[in-house]
Amino acid sequence: MNISIESQLINYCLLFFTVVIIPIFYYIYKIVYLYLSHKLRESLINTSARIFKENESFVKQIIFTITDGVGNLRQDIMDHLQYRQTCNSIKYIVDKVFVLIDNISAIYSNTPVENYNYQYCDNITPVQPLGCGAYCPYYQPYDATFNPDCNLNYDTIYNFDFDKDIIKCDNTSECSETNETNKNTSHKLKFEYPKRCRKSRRNSRVFSRNFLKTKKSRENNSKTSTTEPFACTKDETTGMYTIKSNAYDTKNSTETNSDNNSEIVSETNSETNYSTPTTAKVNIDDVLAAMTTVYDKSDFGLNDKIKENVADSLKKMCDSSGNIKVDFDDQKLFKTVFDSVYQGLMTDPSIVDNSGYSSPTNESLNGSLTETLNESLNGSFDNSINNIKETLNKSLMDFIDCPSGSINFSNKN
């Protein structure tokens, strides 16, 4: 037979014994102790006096003195022990209070988290490629286990060595040989589109579906083993890598190369044309240069805060991979940029200057943005717009560091 006792009942019993039973036992012990000690003292004195009959009064006085001294000594010892116990108890309580205060202050302080054995993510290194057979051409070098709350070092994430981190392989047995071949050729990076590439929501957003849309396109890609849909070259003056995108076909293909390897190479076919997604690097400074004349300080009372908020607005347009997806068209591109900047400016209260000027109104700011857009497209700012168009045509990169001030515009064909 199992007997279950409620824990609450046990707690009540312990409380009852602590508050009621133990004090009663203590007082009973104290009464019995005092009574017995008194009787023993009387018996000792009377017995000693009977032994020394001729000096009975003297013996009683000596015995009383001895017993009083022993009793006082005992009481002093008990008082001292009780005092020490009280002091120790107080000391223990005070120590625990200070420990509790230290713990609370440590939890709610602004001390760097590495003091508590947490790890920063400042030096996240790119993960290695998936391998020869499973490598995807648009695979982003991210650490899949990174914590979004960590402070990511984008320079470390996005800047990696093409020679070391990407290897073009037709099959697994040719990895080492192909790697050495790539290092000895003018095109440092060559790779084919794989026959299989994992399909996921992220890939559907980042990758172009033209390569995986039909079985025919996959077969055509596998047959053109000598065609290079992407060729990566390094500019020795700037140290930047440039990816040249080649549209290719399976039959009659023509390839045109420029001297600086920066033009988009196209190959045409009478029956089927295969196009590749292009990614262009657009610098925020070029966009701001086209806006500087319109956003004059005297118009709205805005100082250099305008550039900071424009840059912040553009950065907010970046997705997790650091890219902004828009159509590769001048008008749509500029409209997307300025519309997003406009939304960022109107929703950011920090743009208002505190030097006595008034905040821009929706109508005036929208009008200036429209004016900037129209004048930019009509060629009023020839120098800035030409710089932007040259950047769109020549600086073809497959990734860019968004927080450093450069934005990616990718075309989905």
Swiss-Prot record:
Biased segments, Low complexity type: 250-263
Bilayer topology annotation: Single-pass membrane protein
Key words of the record: Glycoprotein, Membrane, Transmembrane, Transmembrane helix
Polar residues composition bias: residue spans: 264-277
Chain positions carrying an annotated carbohydrate: 46, 55, 103, 171, 179, 184, 220, 252, 260, 273, 362, 366, 374, 378, 393, 408
Intracellular or extracellular location(s): Membrane
Coiled coil: none
Keyword Ubl conjugation: no
Source domain of life: Viruses
Transmembrane segments: 14-34
GO CC terms in record: membrane
Principal place of residence: membrane
Ranges for region Disordered: 250-277
Protein name: Uncharacterized protein R474
Species assigned in the record: Acanthamoeba polyphaga mimivirus (APMV)
